[in-house]
């Protein structure tokens, strides 16, 4: 770690002054959006970020937002960041400690971290991976960077960072007037930046460095954002409208409450409509649920979305639990193997080194026993930051915001677009009313198919059940949750030890009248996880409190999150795919204005809903998105129409 005093002085001179951040931030209050976007190549220890935040907090008008996007190929370890922060001055120490608390260990995905300071909001998007590739992955979004901090080693030590691909991505994320600053004055850097449309000026460098480069972007016809698009149909750039201040969300379960909270934090007025008498009355109302990750053999787009969502959920729950009580217990979760075959698969997966040990670690049978007081015959995975919580209390915490109005025992009968607003017919208190909203978000998983105006999404229903036992004092139970095919969660009320088990399900939309069969299936799953505990519970004939619920999922088991397409218009736009499935059609989709959907999370709602809500709020608020482009493809509602067109089924 280098000298902090010199590093701070150099950063202030080269990047803060080089981009004239103080003067430009002071002018934000004269704009309608009150936002400023900074991009950085090379996050390092976060010093440039902290100094930019300090400048923003000092000089931005109240209510302003700083969006900071940074790429980093080699993230520093958390312990090294901790050592670095100890040496920082008091002026940035508070924010630095908050960064340390939320700092994600290496994981090649996009990590969104939000800092709430006294008068403004700071939003950090950390993109782990090669800067050229990671910035390219977000070029299709509505990023328009105001200032670039081009840090990193000099080109002779890190030539790959300064290549033409990176400069193309930087240009695609810039707009006329975007500035940059870098301490290097190398000819390679200057030529590449000039070639993509920047006017470059050589200035006096800091200290012993004779020169540095600054400049501004002058958009030219040779720079086209479309040149970087791999999936043009998934663009969300047309999804946000000019006016989105009053929003209706249908469904007050986990996804609805998470989405409402994300929007309310941004100042939107949200009406949260729930047809049942209580919030989180469906499967969101289980007494106890897990927040966990299912590791896969490869980090493809689907798994990167899941991993991104998992880490984001942990950060949000850790932060929210400081001001709200939903019995969040991030004590870790163990996934033990239940056979030699499973143990071999876990060993093979671990050898791929896809996950940092801070997120997932391989543990042998003895270590499992030490961690959870549970005798295992096999090794397994340990998820240090995962845990369990009370879903109902969580939904209540999300909905308890001054910008959210909750209406229970109110049912949405229909909605239609009229005079640039959504007219929503609502029945409640023995009367029907029609309310007008700028935007409408469907989070009512079980009833979403009742709206005939929606596209024909391939939805599927699964019935599941949890069984909760009061555990006698003489019973020994694991001290941490266990999960495999099924799961068990030890937890406490004020005076009682409880154990919730689950994992069984039955497919179909039919109603289940009896839970006895599912209770036996849960007991069978428990036998695989903990034979001793299974024997004790069945031997003592403990009675369980059973709770049946129905979850909504989709044909490809990925949620539907995003703007709802205009089916007829999109069929016409992408009709060429019926003749050539591999053709790239350069056309933005047409959406139903202000209509969004967020359903189909299945049993992963607690893990994926926070990021899903953040993603929708970012679209509606016309800001940087917390998903990379290939992750958006995974959850975009339009994906099904595109697939049908390619298969000539539409």
Please state what every model-predicted region is.
Residues 244-272:
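N-terminal Rossmann-like FAD-binding beta1-loop-alpha1 element of flavoenzymes
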Residues 265-285:
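Glycine-rich FAD pyrophosphate-binding loop
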Residues 429-524, 530-546:
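Flavin-dependent oxidoreductases
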Residues 288-371:
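Dinucleotide-binding Rossmann-like beta1-alpha1 core, especially the glycine-rich loop
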Residues 92, 297-300, 324-335, 362-401, ...:
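Helix-loop-beta segment of a Rossmann-like dinucleotide-binding subdomain
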Residues 381-429, 433-435, 439, 443-444, ...:
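Helical element adjacent to the flavin cofactor pocket in flavoenzyme catalytic cores
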Residues 537-650:
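C-terminal catalytic lobe of FAD-dependent flavoproteins
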Residues 28-144, 164:
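The AdoMet/dcAdoMet-binding core of the Class I SAM-like
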